[in-house]
Amino acid sequence: MPLEIDADAPLSKTERLMLSLGITEDDLDLNAEGKLSPAQLQQLKIDRENQTWQMYAVGFIAVSTAFNLITGSGRVSESFLNSPVILLVIALLATVHAARKRNELKVDIDAGLVKRLDGPVQAVVPQRWWTYAVVSNDIRFQVPRRTFKAFTFGERYTIYYVPRTMKVVGVEPLL
């Protein structure tokens, strides 16, 4: 059942974290058993679909650049850095990386398993504006910005994650 919040009451740490990840107490209960909830499984499938479209977009750039080079539409300049060849190489590498990430996420979805890690959470510094990460027991996890802001750094948490991609699916403070 969805988390219901009294608008006048302050949020507990658990409630803040659950809201930041879009999960419920039932999700956390299943995570504690080492399983993904149906809602978490659905979210991972949506993430994989988004990665698929990203891979197609980057692959299209690679194919377009290769076509331009083959047909002579794309002129190879004297400077390698100004050349479409460098764009082709970057696009191909990005496509391979996206395909690998997509396949890793499929392994996590098919397994449906969740691992847990108990320990103090620290912020990774410096943070870039487009990615946020935390470290617990020398293991780094990328998290959404809203989840990053929900942590109280230095305190102990249980982090639930899928093992292959290290994607965080649930977090709760240790009491």
Task: Describe each PLM feature range.
Residues V107-R128, T158:
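Structural detector for short beta-strands of small beta-barrel domains
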Residues P2-T52:
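Cytosolic juxtamembrane N-terminal segments of multi-pass membrane proteins
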Residues R128-W130, T165:
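Short acidic/glycine-enriched loop/turn segments that link adjacent beta-strands
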